[in-house]
A protein has these predicted regions:
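Bacterial N-terminal signal peptides that target proteins for export
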Residues: 2-13
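Active-site beta->alpha N-cap acidic-glycine motif
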Residues: 33-126, 306-319, 340, 390-398, ...
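Active-site-adjacent pocket scaffolds in enzyme catalytic domains
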Residues: 36-41, 177-304, 379-384
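Well-ordered, non-membrane alpha-helical segments in soluble/globular domains
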Residues: 73-91, 116-125, 152-162, 283-300, ...
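Metal-dependent polysaccharide deacetylase catalytic core of the NodB/CE4 family, i.e.
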Residues: 100, 105-182, 242-273, 305-323, ...
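C-terminal domain-boundary segment and adjacent tail
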Residues: 199-219, 269-398, 402
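Acidic-aromatic substrate-binding/catalytic surfaces of carbohydrate-active enzymes
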Residues: 406-482
Length: 483
């Protein structure tokens, strides 16, 4: 009898202990991101189609371009990385867009830095994850990992960098995405198959002759990358890497056709990027340009594509970068406030979510690249290289990208300025060796918008050969009625 009674008491005690531990674990889970749980629940049924999205990301680093674990190019920016800059940035975003969830990417050196300002800053970033639901992730190689490091080394950096992020945040945290600038297919494959990460900002659309690397030739909206080249959309199941490739910054489609920076007053990266758009021209012109570029996606682009996306990375150093770089005494934060306020006024239903969340929404909608058919139309904003008389139409899909440029002053027909074919074989450069970086990873074939090669001259669409016309006709028959 005593044995039976003891068994009953023991069983009940075990049940009570189980309930207690489950309750404790549940409370811990609620505590982790308890402020974000309410926000996340509101977007539980969020779909890609029918919505406008804004992804806002920032980078925490020590040096301007950390090309590898222990080598850097450019200026030491540690003096403008502190609690003050981080609070200024995050509070401005929350004020301008209440409920926004943003993505923080930390460099290798920032993760390793044990100085008080970096330790305090990292704790603050973790608190934003818990309070707002922000994503925290890793950035390898200062946007240019493959230009300076072997693919194997980049994989190792990704593995250990992501591990450091998980340890920093704690409680089994894992980001949904990575910020990388440019990233080779081998590293995108590694992220998907070995790290379980299926979203990467792995291309900078139209970047050429800017900073430390070139990667011109991709489409500007999300796609599954090919195993041949990160700029190329996968052509079939065997070619597909299950890591969505995202652009980092939308740019003005008209200024994007130029090469480099500082061509007079023309900056090819003008659009929403902080340096070329706000810090150089100033707040008045800069915010006008940012709103015009945003409208090309949130108005016309939304009507054409049934969803819209504006991507933006603002490095944390820029909050007080004027202390290092001058920037005519500007920090751009007033421009950010105006831009965010105007976005909220004009498109109140737009969603500001993390890069990882947006990528996963896209991934749930598209299982491959077969149905991709992105169309964009933009007229010049009148600011610098975005001439008011110019207009451009872009068509982007799995097979090719096509750009048609028009001039309302005297030009009788649109000109083809870009026809990049993705049905052709593509090949990336080999790994860098001997301490010599490999800068140019662009994908250029038939005709490229930058005009850097002798063959890159604008042509009438009827000057394409019969095979090229047939390729375009398969997607857009309206363009070949004249042929």
């Amino acid at each position: 009898m005593r044995i039976k009674l003891l068994k009953k008491v023991t069983a009940r005690l075990l049940i009570l202990l189980s309930v207690f531990f489950i309750s404790c674990n549940t409370r811990q889970k609620v505590k982790l991101g308890s402020g974000s749980a309410v926000r996340l629940s509101k977007d539980k049924e969020l779909k890609l189609i029918g919505n406008r999205f804004f992804t806002l990301s920032t980078v925490v680093r020590v040096n301007q371009i950390e090309t590898s674990r222990n080598k850097s190019d450019g200026t030491d920016e540690s003096s403008v990385h502190s609690l003050e800059e981080a609070r200024t940035f995050r509070e401005a975003n929350e004020k301008g867009w209440p409920g926004a969830r943003i993505t923080w990417a930390l460099s290798w050196l920032a993760l390793k830095d044990h100085r008080p300002n970096y330790m305090d800053l990292k704790k603050l970033v973790v608190s934003y994850h818990e309070k707002y639901g922000d994503e925290i992730t890793f950035i390898p190689g200062g946007y240019f990992a493959n230009m300076y490091n072997s693919r194997a080394q980049v994989n190792l950096d990704l593995h250990e960098g992501l591990q450091m992020v998980s340890e920093m945040v704690g409680r089994g945290y894992r980001p949904q995405s990575v910020i990388a600038g440019f990233l080779s297919p081998e590293n995108l494959r590694y992220l998907a198959e070995e790290e379980g990460i299926h979203i990467c900002q792995g291309n900078i659309w139209s970047q050429y002759a800017v900073d430390n690397g070139d990667g011109e030739g991709s489409i500007s909206y999300p796609y599954y990358p090919s195993r041949e080249h990160f700029c190329k959309p996968a052509q079939c199941k065997a070619d597909l890497i299950d890591c969505i490739n995202l652009d980092g910054w939308i740019v003005d489609f008209l200024t994007a056709r130029f090469s480099g920076i500082g061509n007079g007053d023309i900056y090819s990266r003008q659009g929403v990027g902080p340096i070329e758009t706000v810090l150089f021209p100033g707040t008045e012109l800069g915010t006008k340009e940012m709103i015009a570029t945003t409208a090309a996606h949130f108005d016309t682009g939304f009507a054409l594509n049934k969803f819209a996306w504006v991507s933006w990375i603002w490095e944390l150093c820029l909050v007080e970068g004027r202390k290092i770089y001058g920037y005519n005494g500007r920090n751009g934060m007033d421009g950010v406030a105006i831009w965010l306020s105007e976005m909220r006024r004009r498109w109140p239903e737009a969603k500001c979510i993390t890069q990882g969340e947006f990528g996963m929404l896209w991934r749930s909608q598209f299982k491959n690249n077969d149905r991709l058919n992105y169309c964009f139309v933009m007229s010049g904003s009148g600011i610098r290289g975005s001439e008011p008389e110019m207009g451009i139409r872009w068509f982007m899909n799995k097979d090719f990208r096509l750009a048609l440029l028009s001039n309302r002053k005297g030009q009788s027909s649109e000109k083809v300025i870009d026809f990049t074919r993705y049905d052709l074989k593509a090949k990336e450069p080999a790994d860098p060796s001997g301490g010599q970086p490999i800068r140019n990873w662009s994908l250029m074939n038939r005709l490229n918008q930058k005009g850097t090669r002798a063959q890159d001259k604008p042509i009438n669409i009827d000057e394409l050969n019969e095979n090229e016309k047939a390729i375009i006709k398969s997607r857009y028959p309206q363009f070949v009625k004249k042929f």
